[in-house]
Amino acid sequence: MAAKDVYFSSDARDKMLRGVNILANAVKVTLGPKGRNVVIEKSFGAPRSTKDGVSVAKEIELADRFENLGAQMIREVASKTNDKAGDGTTTATVLAQAIVQEGLKSVAAGMNPMDLKRGIDKAVHVVVDSIKASSKKVTTNNEIAQVGTISANGDKDVGEMIAKAMDKVGNEGVITVEEAKTAETELDVVEGMQFDRGYLSPYFITNADKMEVQLEEPLILLFEKKLSSLQPLLPVLEAVVQSGRPLVIIAEDVEGEALATLVVNKLRGGLRVAAVKAPGFGDRRKAMLEDIAILTGAQVISEDLGIKLENVSLDMLGKAKKVSITKDDTTIVDGVGEKTAIEARIGQIKKQIEDTTSDYDKEKLQERLAKLAGGVAVIRVGGSTEVEVKEKKDRVDDALNATRAAVEEGIVPGGGVALLKASKALATLVGDNDDQTAGIAIVRRALQAPIRQIAENAGVEGSIVVGKILENDSPTFGFNAQTEQYVDLIADGVIDPAKVVRTALQDAASVAGLLITTEAAIVEAPKKGGGAGGPPGGGMGGMGDMDF
């Protein structure tokens, strides 16, 4: 086992505080509408310029390992807040730095770190309740666009595009952000359920110009095994022909004689039909077939359920307004499944998302949820240069996450004002002893840090801004750093999602509490002599037992 270096109490805390300050000072310059740019060197390609706090935090690795411990703990605040709320990373970093700095001063003055932490936790609890109570629900498209615009650093087009995407696919739908091949930023919406399986034979194509199968009002047969012979299906196929409607077969595979027979019937005009492989593999395939069944009002033909192919009747087939199939994708639009059954299935998938610990499973469940709940929108971000596209994509990602959070828990005045106003709730709060009350005072002072930083980034004196806002009793009065005016922030469209503000404070206080109560820090000791250290006697470093 490698040797370790150990620092104790104030030595450990001072070293870690230096790391906290280095990282936080680099991140906090990006805060607010007049946030400055940070340029990051890349090992290959052009340097990257960004105003995204979490991107800056991820790039910082310090040479001094004790300082790096502090920096990494603050980086954890940024990434935790990003995971939970998708935005607010810079605010969380600024809050954490403020709480740590004040907290460590109090510890150095002889206060009990555990009581300070209890006071901090008590204050955070009160502030979070105050933020929740003052939040306003987001309902209109205009409000959604405002949230998106703020998070995209004032880019109105991005805000409007996100509002449009959410309007099209609903709050549960999936909205993805990709880099465009052109200079334009555009929105592409796929309504209905789409999965990544195309037609099994080009002979099924009905629209030769677009190379697509387009079937109006089709019946949909779902079979979970391979289909190699159509013999057992003849009774239901005859019934389909008599109904005069087209048929889509979705099965694990359709092969050999079965596929040939379907193609021949399609070419002769006896049966308008298309066959597609079922999406996914294994258990996920079963689940997705079940999703399609619920969406289209079908019954999955499965021997597990005791249903044989020869017993299939027309009422076991699903229905939809339209099915489009390309060589890569199948889209089912307006399935006729019962609304209550679809909602129950959505609830079930949401529960699975909450329970799963695997990121991969979560992503796949989220995709299934979107397919059931309304569709997929893709925002393709364009720009003149690669650097510009990457920077804009960061902002669009932030804006999208912030907008989702706003729809979930409502909005509060932006620009750090919600935190500043919430600090008034701490005016009469006292702890069980003086040290706890000092912890409450630490949070009260720290809540001013974000608005001070926003003002300073805009070139205005932070303490004057804080004083003016605290003098005014209106909960929505604040400083708009974009216009450098004092206004009603909600009316002016300067808003933050309540979830982002709340999460930023909770995560910042959690990590700051850990740093304040740290009594020892352990890192690996630097190796003496540095080289690659192979055993004596030739060979490459680290490969001394090989002969050459």
Curated annotation (Swiss-Prot):
Annotated binding of ATP, by residue: T30, L31, G32, P33, K51, D87, G88, T89, T90, T91, G415, D496
**Broad class of enzyme this protein falls into:** isomerase
Q: Which InterPro entries match?
A: Chaperonin_Cpn60_CS, Cpn60/GroEL, Cpn60/GroEL/TCP-1, GroEL-like_apical_dom_sf, GROEL-like_equatorial_sf, TCP-1-like_intermed_sf
Assigned protein family: Belongs to the chaperonin (HSP60) family.
Start and end residues of each stretch annotated as Disordered: 527-548
Q: What protein name does the entry list?
A: Chaperonin GroEL
Q: Which Pfam families match?
A: Cpn60_TCP1 (PF00118)
Q: What's the catalysed reaction? A: ATP + H2O + a folded polypeptide = ADP + phosphate + an unfolded polypeptide
Q: Compositional bias (Gly residues) at which positions?
A: 528-548
Subunit organization: Forms a cylinder of 14 subunits composed of two heptameric rings stacked back-to-back. Interacts with the co-chaperonin GroES.
UniProtKB keywords: ATP-binding, Chaperone, Cytoplasm, Isomerase, Nucleotide-binding
- Membrane-spanning residues: none
For this UniProt entry, the molecular function terms from Gene Ontology, in alphabetical order, are: ATP binding; ATP-dependent protein folding chaperone; isomerase activity; unfolded protein binding
The answer to whether the entry has keyword Nucleotide-binding is: yes
Chain's role: Together with its co-chaperonin GroES, plays an essential role in assisting protein folding. The GroEL-GroES system forms a nano-cage that allows encapsulation of the non-native substrate proteins and provides a physical environment optimized to promote and accelerate protein folding.
4Fe-4S among the record's keywords?
A: no
Please indicate which superkingdom the organism of origin belongs to. Answer: Bacteria
User: Sorted alphabetically, which HAMAP family does this protein's record hold?
Assistant: CH60 (MF_00600)
Designated gene of the protein: groEL
- GO CC field: cytoplasm
Compartments in which it is found: Cytoplasm
What the entry lists under NCBIfam families is as follows: GroEL, PRK00013.1, PRK12849.1, PRK12850.1, PRK12851.1
Enzyme Commission no: 5.6.1.7
Q: Which GO terms describe its biological process?
A: protein refolding
- PANTHER family (alphabetical): 60 KDA HEAT SHOCK PROTEIN, MITOCHONDRIAL
